[in-house]
């Protein structure tokens, strides 16, 4: 039987697509601020620090949601955790669109951040647990495709709302319409998530083998449901032993856990350190500074999302064919080149006005698009795939929560720090907005060397054999547990 004949591809993609709606709301919720931040700045009278806080406060909620995700998904199950995220998204969208004070705006955006953090951890966790190993990269790639689709959708909606609108209307009502538009996908997610099955791995952890087998029989064909159930149960034996010995949460001397956690956290941090979310949050601000035209800047931002969507589709196709490590390395170098190109034309924008400024703005956009293309087919997809699959079952919930939290801590720092750098008088006079792009390009180079040194190839490795594969990059274990052996056993 061919690998494809072993499982029901359509069913796996269907339930993963439902889970990926959490990713769509993730992208929608985080990117909606890009078009609204100008009017919000005027409405609440914010300075550069206030703008940074308005944008980055969501990341604080994301950190809380990511840290809580392991406990919530472990106790309630992956399905109920996704439903909780959907409800929090809905509350945030309604509340942030109706507020009258900046304090309450922050509160409701923080609630949305908790939803994003929860969905960002649980959605890929669910997908990796219901997907056969040969489909895992493609299935989890749907998560990033959904994130980017949500971003493209809100970039387009923001542009259509702002097109032809007066500045006074945008300041008074426009930003509320932008934020409130999220209610529609929120309600859709609340509805459809109730129809997906619970993760078979979680059911096994709860002792509900019958429910796990029922789901596995819808995913796999022939004798494979029983075989996969046995693999899951075998992989949990060590964890059960540690529970009996009261070592479940004591990772202080667990070198394997800390090495894998180090790799997972660094992959998550480096994904953010490329500066991708500066493109998501502040592209209209950067482009408006360079062109002097807000409507043109919002229109250009749509193309950043479109290119990311195309790149994400390419990455989802290549991830299980080329492998994680080659794509991450190529993407890191290509992203650095795009950022250097962007920084060059930002530097050249000083003193330009009118049509010349708009023309130079399109050169800046070209650099952003080059960066986004390379980032999208590599780190946009690859970081999520790697973080969702490198943690073995015994440390899965805790490890993923730690890595996703690290991602959002770095997101917060960058989101808060960029407006301060971008408005800094000294940096503007000497670099005209190019300085942050140089920093991000340097981080891309660092990402290349980190992946080369610390990340083994995980393509085709089962979750049950992942720990041996990851430890093959350590000096002690590499000789004892070769990565080829781990793959051969898969």
Regions picked out by a protein language model, each given a short descriptive name:
Residues 227-239:
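TPR/TPR-like alpha-solenoid helical repeat scaffolds
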Residues 218-228:
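Short intracellular "coupling" helices and adjacent cytoplasmic loop segments at the cytosolic face
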């Amino acid at each position: 039987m061919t690998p494809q004949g072993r499982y029901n591809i359509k069913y796996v993609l269907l339930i993963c697509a439902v889970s990926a709606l959490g990713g769509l709301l993730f992208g929608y919720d985080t990117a909606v601020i890009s078009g609204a931040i100008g009017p919000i700045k005027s409405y609440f009278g914010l300075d550069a620090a206030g703008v940074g806080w308005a944008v980055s406060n969501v990341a604080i909620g994301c950190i809380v949601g990511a840290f809580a995700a392991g406990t919530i998904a472990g106790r309630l199950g992956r399905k109920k955790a996704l439903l909780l995220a959907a409800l929090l998204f809905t509350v945030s969208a309604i509340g942030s669109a109706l507020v009258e004070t900046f304090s309450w705006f922050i509160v409701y955006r923080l609630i949305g951040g908790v939803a994003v953090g929860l969905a960002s951890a649980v959605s890929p966790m669910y997908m990796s647990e219901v997907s056969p190993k040969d489909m895992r990269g493609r299935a989890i790639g749907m998560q990033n495709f959904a994130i980017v689709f949500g971003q493209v959708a809100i970039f387009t909606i923001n542009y259509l709302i702002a097109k032809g609108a007066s500045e006074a209307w945008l300041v008074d009502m426009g930003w509320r319409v932008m934020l409130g538009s999220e209610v529609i996908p929120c309600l859709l997610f609340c509805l459809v998530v109730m129809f997906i099955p619970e993760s078979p791995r979680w059911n096994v952890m709860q002792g509900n083998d019958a429910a796990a087998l029922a789901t596995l029989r819808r995913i796999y064909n022939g004798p494979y449901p029983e075989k996969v159930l046995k693999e899951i149960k075998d992989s949990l034996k060590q964890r059960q032993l540690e529970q009996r010995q009261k070592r479940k949460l004591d990772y202080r001397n667990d070198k394997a856990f800390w090495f894998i956690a180090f790799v997972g956290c660094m992959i998550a941090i480096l994904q953010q350190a490329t500066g991708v979310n500066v493109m998501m949050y502040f592209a209209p601000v950067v482009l408006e500074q360079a062109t002097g035209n807000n409507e043109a800047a919002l229109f250009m931002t749509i193309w950043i999302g479109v290119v990311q969507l195309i790149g994400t589709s390419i990455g989802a196709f290549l991830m299980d064919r080329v492998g994680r490590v080659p794509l991450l390395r190529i993407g890191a170098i290509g992203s650095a080149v795009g950022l250097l190109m962007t920084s060059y034309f930002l530097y050249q924008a000083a003193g330009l006005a009118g049509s010349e400024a708009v023309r130079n703005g399109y050169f800046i956009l070209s650099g952003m698009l080059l960066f986004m293309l390379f980032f999208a087919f590599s780190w946009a997809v690859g970081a999520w795939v790697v973080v969702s699959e490198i943690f073995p079952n015994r440390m899965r919930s805790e490890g993923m929560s730690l890595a996703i939290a690290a991602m959002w801590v770095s997101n917060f720092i960058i989101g808060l720090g960029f407006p301060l750098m971008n408005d800094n008088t000294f940096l503007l006079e000497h670099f005209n907005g190019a300085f942050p792009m140089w920093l991000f390009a340097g981080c891309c180079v660092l990402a290349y060397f980190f992946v080369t040194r610390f990340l083994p190839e995980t393509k085709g490795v089962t979750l049950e054999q992942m720990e041996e594969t990851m430890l093959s990059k350590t000096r002690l274990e590499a000789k004892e547990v070769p990565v080829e052996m781990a793959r051969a056993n898969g």
